[in-house]
């Protein structure tokens, strides 16, 4: 649940804590990650953090002491808009149901309420998203992006967007560890 709107942040946190569905609800915070700021891939991972494709659930500590997700809004808005640009039926397409455009007019207006400016800094290029002054409502865009982040958190991914996992050494039994220790002495 979007917890970035200042007036409702505490309400969202309280709802996520007190809901009968608290085990599966997370407040979310989109963060502007521009070309000159540190990308999510370079954040230092702390014990207890859950990290995914341009999102992370930090270990809980501090004032609100509740699990929450933080994600790179620029990356996820670009990802979501790219899905809308894929031809119907092709892999990676995001399609809207029905065949009556008038039924989706408000959704379309809000999903296009922002535009990006491609910027460069620190050796990387990033689409930085800005609000259109004539279209102040972007609630459906925020919801759509939040759904994409949520899907990623649940394991959904497109070919080529998966993060290479850290190579894990095979698990050893206690007996094997003892044998290995004796060999090394």
What are the residue ranges of the model-derived segments?
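Mg2+-dependent endonuclease catalytic cores in nucleic-acid-processing enzymes, primarily RNase H-like
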Residues: 1-123, 157, 167-185
């Amino acid at each position: 649940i979007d917890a970035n709107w200042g007036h409702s942040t505490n309400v969202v946190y309280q709802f996520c804590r007190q809901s009968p569905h608290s085990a599966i609800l997370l407040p979310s915070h989109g963060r502007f990650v521009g070309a000159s700021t540190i990308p999510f891939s370079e954040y230092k991972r702390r014990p207890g953090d859950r990290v995914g494709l341009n999102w992370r659930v930090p270990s809980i500590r501090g004032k609100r002491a509740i699990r929450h997700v933080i994600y790179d809004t620029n990356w996820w808005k670009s990802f979501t808009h790219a899905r809308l640009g894929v031809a119907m039926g092709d892999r990676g397409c995001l399609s809207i149901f029905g065949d009556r455009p008038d039924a989706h007019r408000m959704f379309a207006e809000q999903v296009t309420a922002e535009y990006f400016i491609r910027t460069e800094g620190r050796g990387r290029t990033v689409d930085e998203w800005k609000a259109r002054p004539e279209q102040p409502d972007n609630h459906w865009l925020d919801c759509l992006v939040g759904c994409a982040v949520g899907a990623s958190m649940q394991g959904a991914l497109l070919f080529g967007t998966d993060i290479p996992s850290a190579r894990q050494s095979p698990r050893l039994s206690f007996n094997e560890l003892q044998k290995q220790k004796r060999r090394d002495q």
